[in-house]
Amino acid sequence: MKLILIKDCPSGKANTIVEVSDGYAKNFLIPRKFAIAYTEENAKKLKQKLEQEKLDFSLKTKEFLELKEKLEKLKLTFKLKASLDKNHKLETHHSISAKKLLERLHELGFDLPKHSIEKVHLNLIGINHVNVKLFDKIVAKLTVVIEADV
């Protein structure tokens, strides 16, 4: 029996056309909503759905590439309390977390989900870079400048 898979299952991935035995289709795949019967109408719907998903994906990709450019031009500056250690080097007492970075980005008008920035604790004075995962394989490199407040 020819079917169109709706969900991923042992027979294949979602949105694919497969050929399986009649019993497997009638007793397992169709009742459990893994698949629907193959008809010309369902095949047209599948084709339209795949074209729409492809279009949506390309639009989202374009959107997130523009966001990536904006984020990479941005420089976030933070001040951390610091003091000289016994070797006369600056030592910070706090760090900048991913949560603080997201809060600052939110203040600047960038609404990103909290999982988009990997867990970081920046405490090195100077220029730091943080990866921001935006969409699929689009990752922006955010520049964070930490200054010493002595």
Swiss-Prot record:
Q: Which residues cross the membrane?
A: none
Which keywords does this Swiss-Prot/TrEMBL entry list?
Ribonucleoprotein, Ribosomal protein, RNA-binding, rRNA-binding
Which GO cellular component terms, listed alphabetically, does the Swiss-Prot or TrEMBL entry include? Answer: ribonucleoprotein complex; ribosome
Molecular function per GO? rRNA binding; structural constituent of ribosome
Q: Give the UniProt record's GO annotations in the biological process aspect.
A: translation
What InterPro entries would the database entry show? Ribosomal_bL9, Ribosomal_bL9/RNase_H1_N, Ribosomal_bL9_bac/chp, Ribosomal_bL9_C, Ribosomal_bL9_C_sf, Ribosomal_bL9_N, Ribosomal_bL9_N_sf
Q: Which Pfam families match?
A: Ribosomal_L9_C (PF03948), Ribosomal_L9_N (PF01281)
Source organism, top-level taxon: Bacteria
NCBIfam families associated with the record: L9
Q: What does this protein do?
A: Binds to the 23S rRNA.
Family membership: Belongs to the bacterial ribosomal protein bL9 family.
Spell out the PANTHER family in the cross-references.
50S RIBOSOMAL PROTEIN L9 (PTHR21368)
Output this protein's name.
Large ribosomal subunit protein bL9
Q: Which gene encodes it?
A: rplI
